[in-house]
Amino acid sequence: YETLNSMKNIQSSSRKRVQACGFTLIELLVVIAIIAILAAMLLPALSKAKSKAQGIKCMSNLRQLTLGWIMYAGDNGERLAPNGNRVNTPAGMLATDSSFQSGGANAQWCPGRMDTGTSPYDDSFIKAGLVYPNVNTTAIYHCPADQSIYPPGTSFGKPRVRSISMNCWLNPITSWNASQGYTGAQALKIFRKTSDFSVPGPTMTFVFIDENPNTIDDAFIVFDPNQNNFWPNVPAS
């Protein structure tokens, strides 16, 4: 009888210990609330770190493109790669003006538009450009932070292959004139060769820039240095 009572006491004591080790509903809610607070504190920091990493990668892409652009000039008598908005096909573009590399197909730094046809998601247009042989990768033509698709606002859109554009005053194929809305266009500085970078100097002139997905079209970004409010194309934010 005493042995039986002892066993009952042991079982009762064990059940009490098991019950004592459990969490109450309030304790579980407190733990969940703490986890939620910690997540809310960490997520902005993680998002900021991701944005910073994307910015660093984008700057690296611009640097590589600029080096490829400089190499092109070095191989072509210091003439800058033609820059413009010629026909939207990888082949058949000609630039016969003496200021450009005369003749030859695909005579511009990067053909194709990001707002029409198949070129927004076809990297063969990038590969047909004059700078590509010096960089040999299409990835650097696109900023990792750019999540835009074409056609925009659709469920079947595809990521654009390019978000980078070139300064429109660096050996433009299209001739600027006053009728296009550029104030004092004839007096604006157009750079044809590396030796033209005198005023302003190279450190005051940008070559490539990440363009806003709402305005990106051809591969050059159009702006008027004489008018602060005249930006047909807008840099990415």
Regions found by a protein language model. Give the residues of each.
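Compositionally biased amphipathic helical and low-complexity segments enriched in hydrophobic
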Residues: N5, S12, I26-V30, P44, ...
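Short amphipathic alpha-helical "recognition" segments used for binding
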Residues: S6, S12-R15, V31, Q54-I56, ...
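Coiled-coil-like amphipathic alpha-helices with heptad-repeat character
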Residues: I10-S12, S47, T137, G157
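Compositionally biased regions
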Residues: M7, S13-R15, K48, I164, ...
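N-terminal leader/signal peptides at the extreme start of proteins
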Residues: Y1-L25
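Amphipathic alpha-helical segments typified by the pilin-like N-terminal helix
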Residues: V18-S60
